[in-house]
Regions:
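Active-site-adjacent structural elements in enzyme catalytic cores
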Residues: 12-362
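N-terminal amphipathic/basic-hydrophobic helices that include classical n-h-c signal peptides
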Residues: 1-14
Length: 362
C-alpha cells in the first residue's frame, strides 16, 4: 500500500506577533529587523506621542491592503503617511504652500497632520482613492529612527480593530492585533492619548478636518482657522483619515451629557437610582465623588484639566470593555482648547448620542 502524505498550508493559522521594546539594549539591531519587515511588505505597530499606529509601507498597495484587512477598516477611509523629517515630504506631494511650510516648522515633529495634493508615487490604496494624502512627522525619536531605517513613508492608522477605541499602550495593541501583524514596537504609554489634528492649508486658511492635540487656538497664531462642517455629520464623505464611520466605540452603548454642571450632575445621579440595568460611569473626579461607592466608575480626571481627560479618554473607553456594563453614562466637557478634540471622539464613540442639559430644563 502506498500512503500519500499531503501537506496543506493553512492560511487561517495566525502569524506570531513579536514585541520589541524601544528600551531594548539591542535597539539599534532591532530597528534594522523592523525595517526589513516593512520593506518585505509586513506590518508593524508603532508608538507615537498620540496613539499607537499600525504601520506598513505606504508606497506599497499590497501593504496598505493588509492594513485595511488587519483593522477591518473600509478601504475608502484614507491612511496617514508618517515621515521621519520634512525633507521626505517633497517626493510625496505636488507642492508645499508657504502656510503649510509654516505649520510644519511650527508643529513638526508633533501631532499635526497636513493634507497635501499627492504625487502618483502614493497609491490610491493608501489615499483611499483621493487625490490628496495626509502626512505627519511623529515626535517620538525612536519611531522616527525606525521610519528612517525603513526608507519609505509609513502608512499608519491607529492600531486597533476598526470602530474600537484607539490604543495608548502596547498591551492594548496586542489585544486587538495579536496574530494579525508581524511585530509591535513597545514604547510605553503614549503622552497625549488623542490622535493628531488633521488640517488642510491650501486655500490660505487652516481648515480642521479632525481636532486633536494641536488645538484651534494654537493654530490661530498662523492664520485664519475654520472647523470643517463635516465634523458634525455622521454621513459625510471622508476628505481625510478618521472622518467617516463610527469610531472609538466601547462594547456597551454610551450616552454623553454636557451643559449646565448642576443639571448634568442631577441627571447622571438619577441613573444610580435605577435598577433596570447595570450602568458604568465615565465621569470627572468631581462627579465620581457623588456616585455610590459600588458604582462601576472610570474617572477621566478633574474638570479643570482637559489634558488629563484627553490622556485618559481611550483607556477609559477600553476600561468598560474589561468591566462589562449594560450602558455607559458619560460626562462631557466644553468645546474650548482640547475640548473640541475630546468631544469629537466622544461624539463618535456614542454614535452621536450627546445630550445637552441646560438650566431651562429645570
Amino acid at each position: 500500500m502506498v500512503r500519500l502524505l499531503v501537506i496543506i498550508e493553512r492560511s487561517d493559522i495566525p502569524m506570531k506577533t513579536e514585541i520589541i521594546k524601544t528600551t531594548d539594549v539591542h535597539w539599534d539591531e532591532k530597528v534594522k529587523h523592523l525595517g526589513e519587515i516593512i520593506r518585505n511588505g509586513g506590518l508593524v505597530a508603532f508608538p507615537t506621542e498620540t496613539v499607537y499606529g499600525l504601520g506598513g509601507n505606504g508606497l506599497n498597495p499590497e501593504a496598505s491592503k493588509k492594513i485595511y484587512a488587519a483593522k477591518g477598516r473600509p478601504s475608502d477611509n484614507p491612511l496617514i503617511l508618517h515621515v521621519s523629517s520634512q525633507e521626505e515630504v517633497s517626493r510625496l506631494v505636488e507642492d508645499i504652500t508657504p502656510l503649510e511650510k509654516k505649520l510644519m516648522d511650527a508643529f513638526w515633529p508633533g501631532p499635526l497632520t497636513i493634507v497635501f495634493p499627492k504625487k502618483d508615487i502614493v497609491p490610491d490604496e493608501t489615499s483611499g482613492g483621493l487625490k490628496t494624502v495626509a502626512i505627519r512627522c511623529p515626535a517620538l525619536k525612536a519611531t522616527r529612527e525606525w521610519i528612517k531605517e525603513c526608507g519609505v513613508p509609513i502608512a499608519g492608522p491607529s492600531a486597533n480593530i476598526s470602530g474600537r477605541p484607539s490604543p495608548t499602550t502596547a498591551e492594548s495593541v496586542l489585544h486587538d492585533m495579536n496574530g494579525r501583524i508581524n511585530a509591535i514596537i513597545d514604547g510605553g504609554a503614549t503622552d497625549i492619548g488623542l490622535e493628531s489634528t488633521i488640517v488642510s492649508a491650501r486655500s490660505g486658511k487652516i481648515v480642521i478636518y479632525r481636532p486633536g492635540g494641536i488645538t484651534r487656538e494654537m493654530l490661530s497664531a498662523y492664520g485664519e482657522v475654520e472647523v470643517d462642517k463635516g465634523l458634525a455629520s455622521p454621513n459625510m464623505h471622508p476628505l481625510a483619515p478618521g472622518m467617516k464611520y463610527r469610531h472609538y466605540a466601547p462594547t456597551a452603548p454610551l450616552t454623553v451629557y454636557v451643559g449646565d454642571t448642576e443639571k448634568v450632575e442631577q441627571t447622571i445621579l438619577s441613573f444610580a437610582e435605577k435598577k433596570d440595568k447595570t450602568y458604568g460611569y465615565f465621569v470627572s473626579e468631581e462627579m465620581a465623588a457623588l456616585l455610590p461607592k459600588d458604582a462601576v466608575v472610570f474617572s477621566w480626571g478633574k474638570r479643570s484639566s482637559q489634558k488629563e481627560m484627553a490622556h485618559r479618554l481611550f483607556s477609559g473607553l477600553l476600561y468598560f470593555n474589561a468591566h462589562p456594563v449594560d450602558a455607559i453614562i458619560g460626562e462631557g466637557t466644553s468645546m474650548n482648547g482640547l475640548g473640541l478634540a475630546i468631544m469629537n471622539r466622544l461624539t463618535k464613540a456614542s454614535g452621536y448620542h450627546i445630550i445637552v442639559e441646560s438650566t431651562q430644563d429645570r
